[in-house]
Amino acid sequence: MSRNDQEPFLVKFLKSSDNSECFFKALESIKELQSEDYLQIITDEEALKIRENDKSLYICDRFSGTVFDHLKQLGCRIVGPQVVTFCMRHQQCVPRAEHPVYNMIMSDVTVSCTSLDKDKREEVHKYVQMMGGRVYRDLNVSVTHLIAGEVGSKKYLVAANLKKPILLPSWIKTLWEKSQEKKITKYTDVNMEDFKCPIFLGCIICVTGLNGIHRKTVQQLTAKHGGQYMGQLKMNECTHLIVQEPKGQKYECARRWNVHCVTLQWFHDSIEKGFCQDESIYKAETRVEAKMVPDTSTPTAQSNAESHTLADVSHISNINGSCVNETMFGSTTSKLECSLENLENLDISMFQAPEDLLDGCRIYLCGFSGRKLDKLRRLINSGGGVRFNQLNEDVTHVIVGDYDDDVRQFWSKSSHRPHVVGAKWLLECFTKGYILPEESYIHTNYQPAGIAVSDQPGNQTAVLDKSGSFSKSALVPAERLQQADEDLLAQYGNDDSTMVEAKLSEALEPEVGPCPGSAHREPCDDSTHISVQEENKSSVSHCILDDSTVREEGLFSQKSFLVLGFSVENKCNIVDIIREHAGKIVSLPSRIVADYAVVPLLGCEVDVTVGEVVTNTWLVTCIDNQTLVDPKSNPLFTPVSVMSGVTPLEDCVISFSQCVGAERDSLVFLANHLGASVQEFFVRKANAKKGMLASTHLIVKEPTGSKYEAAKKWSLPAVNISWLLETARIGKRADENHFLVDNAPKQEQVLETKIPNGVSSNPDLPAHPDAHLEIHRKKAVTPLDMNRFQSRAFRAVISQQRGQDPTFPPVRQPLTKEPSLHLDTPSKFLSKDKLFKPSFDVTDALAALETPNAASQKRKLSSPLSEVIVRNLTVALANSSRNTDSHSASPQLKGAHLEEEETRKPLDSVVVCVSKKLSKKQSELNGVAASLGAEYRWSFDETVTHFIYQGRANDSNREYKSAKERGVHIVSEHWLLECAQEYKHLPESLYPHTYNPKMSLDINTVQDGRLCNSRAPLAVSASKDDGPDHLSVEGNETNTMGTNDKESPLLNGSGRDDCKGALTQALEMRENFQKQLQEIMSATCIVKTPAQKTCMSRSSCNSASSTPDSARSVRSGRSRVLEALRQSRQAVPDVNTEPSQNEQIIWDDPTAREERARLASNLQWPSDPTQHSELQVEIKMPDDSPSRKPVYHSEIAEQASCVTQAPGHPGSEEPEPPVAERPLIPEPQAPAVASPLAKPPVAPQPADKIETQEETHRKVKKQYVFQMSSLNSQERIDYCRLIKDLGGSVIEKQCSDPSCTHMVVGYPLRNEKYLASMAAGKWVLHRSYLDACKTAGRFVQEEDYEWGSSSILDALPDVTEHQQKLALAAMRWRKRIQQSQESGIVEGAFSGWKAILRVDRPREAGFKRLLQAGGAKVLSGHPEPLLKDATHLFCDFNKLKPDDCRVFIAEATAQNMVCLKTEYIADYLMLESPPCADNYRVSEAALFHNKKGGPGLPQKRKTPAENVVKRPRVH
């Protein structure tokens, strides 16, 4: 429907069967004004075919239905017929609105909304715009009407003073409904007075101090004008309190609850003026002047009392008189209550202090009675303080009047001493509006003599822990006394930091208690700590400083907080912490919108509006790093969603690594809440004496560290933090395979806290993997944390004694107020004219650091050294040279940068597990496997590829059955030993678990690709630096060109020429070598199938320069194997030597020759096409190629767009030499396809070539059902999301599915999914197809991204010859089957076959699915009628009883059925022409066939033409 630029503007009328009369009037009116050439009348069907916004004007009669929604989604300009008639009548232009316009009833109306919820506001906006009106979110002079949900907002007050109509949302709804019914033509046709906003809408009014008549009048008028009257004052419900006089209980509560306290005049003026008045004008307040004279004529006793200085007061104390600081007493004014005149007559309402002034203060009153006590109680309640009726250790302040002996006894006995102050401190705090330092108001009876408050070590706890007033104190420096009373100082000498640390630890502790069953609950000192560096505060805070300075320059200055969901004690602690860092606390109810709501880790209900909801973990992290951290940078900073009532991790024992600080504490709590047991040490076996359980999971951030290595060694899952969060979210144990830390990209740290100033909560420190930049915390793992010491010299000495390099962490920013207070550092006032050089006696310091828990803290995190020497020395040596760089999963270009790579070992991709039956040899066999590059497992798991077992053919051993069901290789121990002796990856089928070397045939002459793929080095060139590129021709699966490890990373022009010459030379060498091998094969007496000859012709030996390995690990037993392993590395065989030259010349034994032929045919390819074949180690993945280069999937798409696809033989094309000009940009680790598409496509964009409507319709209905194979888990997740976003579906099965239409594979493998897709003629695509779909935003054409197309194979230099055959075969079958389907014949690759399967049961289902995918009919059972109908019999008698096999084959041969090996199925698909069936005939069937056709047996014999297996009718 697109039009040319010269085409004029079109008006399209959408015609339907129920068009109204107005529709036809509009059509006639436009016809009178404009030519019919510019008018179009379209139907609903034509409208649905529109695929883009063609800038036309659409006239729709109904603003609902499928057609309207379709045009609206395309962004078309839509108006109703009433708009056309209105514009014609008034000679106006049709409005150019981005939204549909139904009529013009509100054409000159501009609306703004206030006090409406989001859904209601959006509904009002939609209706106004559809009726031709305009909408402004802000109130300005253009607004004509205000739509209000309730009164009292700023918009409401401004609009009311400007005399603008303030209406209800129902006015808009009524206009829309009446316009639909064609009852109105203008908004003025509806009476606005009926929809005027009531004066007190949304107000809940309560009164106090009014008489009965006035109260009754207020109640009636409130209900009449839309308000609600309430007799009782209720918190969070009442909005206004009408006050006669500003006093009374209701008034006090209303002020505390932020209820508007207004006079009665406010009520009457609101009714008189017609709108709710501003409450601030009518605020009920007390007079400023306070009554200082009693109401009665009788004077009080204290009114005439004289003030005395403390020097004039005689007081006897039990404190040593020599410790009295006379200077302090002489300069201090009276603190006694005698100076507080008229406390009984004090008017509390005169104070204008904030309602949360005393928040966090727990106050005990003593020595007061009567009206004084009542006044102080009311004062404390109005300030938000907590009053205690009994004196205990939770009290932070004691306000004393008369002397109280109970307080004195508590003071002398308790180690926790609250501030004992007079009532004047409380009154002056209310007068100034903030908490004043208590030191100046401490009662003389309860003040330690001679020790300034700032210098008391023990008092730091009280100062910081209780009121947070330490940083606000106006401290007076005093001379420190040389000697004091020993008994008194003993109370303060305990410099135990745990008292200080306990507070923030309690604040961090979530509200849910510890779960039972936890193996090890984290101790208190492993929670969030405040460092002992806080002691320095007393020495740097000797300046008199105003409170406002601290509040303005603190961490949380100008930030408001709302604390919800915590217990009273924890809430008080958190409030103190926030206030200490200049934050403001918002109490409920309040109209202030807090910046942050601090809630527990598991969250709580937040029913008020706040900026962001954060957890206490975020709060502690901000304090640790002294900066405001982004709450979105870590999922623990916001409430974690947890399914309640379930504990999915009850049987799990979890250990954490690389998690420190508040993050670790939160994760430990979360794990305990989910039922898991958390323990510090990561152990494999339980130890009841030490209270340790066997670990089941390790949660780690990065795949490094001793715990991670132990997890890999023990085959325990090492997952990231996301696993724990996902388990909490879904309420069941998440799949660990999706969250393995190995699968996560290195550059992506999901839970790493990103700090703006560069301080990270998890810095990467290789020397100290557990080091963490935090101030208030000790490490939980490291027994002796060097980073806790400030002295670099001290840390250096400790490092030398521990045998480590003195690696110092980055400079840390301590949590102190010095930067904001602009104070000098301690070094400046310790001594101004001397350089401070501390010296340490390291011996004494280290001895002092020893604690009773040191022994338990120094437990080894790994196995004993003796065990490592005995079992793992070879493993360490093998792993030390292993290349750990992870390759991209995408095809990569040839580049000039060549990385040095160690020679790969024979069993690099193998994971072995030794049966418990061979437990005595397990350590020895594991060592042999590790020396060959294989990994080993102590217990069988899903990662094992080879199970080493020795037993009978049909053994009933449980381990054997499990391994057999998994489909892994079950081999004899001799296979591993022979691999070590030959230093080759020998075929597994030659060494079954029943293998007995004394009863086995000599099969050294039978070699397939893996035998020749020897890792033993061959010296092709003696030059190490300047020689030509080495030729590396792998076996039947590898055809890659390796380059010299010492080659220059950049290729200039001459380098390219040399490369081309070397490449040509290498090809010639390979060709000559293949000819030699063919001659050798033809000369031998062994009968080989053509497929085997092809395999042997491709075989070659790996050539690379190497040197013998040094020092193998010492092992007991089988030294012959290790000695042979060393000698095999030094041996340099001749390239031109035939494989059988080293054998003795013997006579030709026909039976032995036949057995060798049978074994050689088994070596050709594994006969199991099921999903387990993906684990076959003989399939060499492209990652093994040493010349792997990065390539972009987008480059493949670009190449595919400009390549004319022409079928050609892959063997005729020469490999492309490396191109230096190609950009060497590495590909990302994983495809970034997780983000949803910006605009989901409505339909695919039109193709370049012209298509008929029928083709387009068929294209739209094309199904996209995907399956994936040989992709890693992250790619599967990302691609699944992309496919679903594009409208396709994904089948996540491990086996093939007939409903699949597209198969996306990483690399072609001879497995069930790939072969079944090939047999069914389905699309077999490269992963770059999905990347191209993501770029285009739709499913694109598949031809250029199909495996086998030149655009894919040319861009993938490391595709082996075997993979290339598979790719070309898939494309060939797809074209054949599609051509037959287009001609009306629905067939597959096996159409016409009627097959019977005689294979072992675990593999039968895979073969059945494969045959059925290709159109074959699989017959079950073997009755004689079925044998008559069947055409093929596929047998694999290795695991079946020989007697049954012979009987069955005899019956099948009698019915002239073709009895073939299962390998025939895969080769039938792969080869261009059908393979010869005789080469795959079962040997037993051949014997019966010969007997049957012998002389004297006149039975029917097939002609040679009939002996060939039928080819299906697919051309």
From Swiss-Prot:
Compartment list: Nucleus; Chromosome; Cytoplasm, Cytoskeleton, Microtubule organizing center, Centrosome; Cytoplasm, Cytoskeleton, Spindle pole
The annotated regions of Polar residues compositional bias extend over 880-891
GO BP annotations, alphabetical order: broken chromosome clustering; chromosome organization; DNA damage checkpoint signaling; DNA damage response; DNA repair; DNA replication checkpoint signaling; double-strand break repair via alternative nonhomologous end joining; double-strand break repair via classical nonhomologous end joining
Describe how it is modified after translation: Phosphorylated on serine and threonine residues in response to X-ray irradiation. Ubiquitinated and degraded by the proteasome. X-ray irradiation reduces ubiquitination. Deubiquitinated by USP13; leading to TOPBP1 stabilizion and activation of the ATR-TOPBP1 axis pathway.
What family classification does the UniProt entry report for this protein? Belongs to the TOPBP1 family.
Listed under subunit, the entry gives: Interacts (via BRCT domains 1 and 2) with (phosphorylated) MDC1; promoting TOPBP1 recruitment to DNA damage sites during mitosis. Interacts (via BRCT domains 7 and 8) with (autophosphorylated) ATR; promoting activation of ATR. Interacts (via BRCT domains 7 and 8) with (phosphorylated) POLQ; specifically binds POLQ phosphorylated by PLK1, promoting POLQ recruitment to DNA damage sites. Interacts (via BRCT domains 1 and 2) with (phosphorylated) RAD9A. Interacts (via BRCT domain 2) with (phosphorylated) TP53BP1. Interacts (via BRCT domain 2) with (phosphorylated) HTATSF1.
For domains, the record's comment is: Some BRCT domains specifically recognize and bind phosphoserine/phosphothreonine marks on proteins. BRCT domains 1 and 2 bind phosphorylated MDC1 and RAD9A. BRCT domain 2 binds phosphorylated HTATSF1 and TP53BP1. BRCT domains 7 and 8 bind phosphorylated ATR, POLQ and RAD51.
This protein's name: DNA topoisomerase 2-binding protein 1
The major lineage groups are:
Eukaryota, Metazoa, Chordata, Craniata, Vertebrata
